[in-house]
Amino acid sequence: MISMSMKTMLRGQIWLYSADPTVGDEIGKTRPAVIVSSNEMGTLRLKVIAPITVWNDVFDSVVWMVKVEPNSNNGLSKRSAIDTFQVRSVSQQRLIKQIGSLSDETMAEVSEALGIVLNVAN
């Protein structure tokens, strides 16, 4: 078994994430999530992630949802949405297994959506 300290977790990687237990309207269950924290943060045992959910056409008008088409690089099996409104810091222990990585172009869209959600300039 690989120890937590041996896992390399980088911005833009997609990991299976165990969200439970959740409270209220928090997105739950085991699902993909993208690491959005900067690699410059060093070896903290926490990562900032944005959960990924199945795409729904109503998300077309939602500025914080970033559409992702499945491909061999990202490891997703369905058209998906990165929910930047549900961004959170989580223990690396919640990140189970890397399944892929996002393109630089998609990460730029994620950064833009995070800027809107957090009201900060990119």
Language-model features, listed with the residues they occupy:
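Conserved functional hotspots at enzyme active or ligand-binding sites that engage polyanionic ligands
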Residues: 1-122
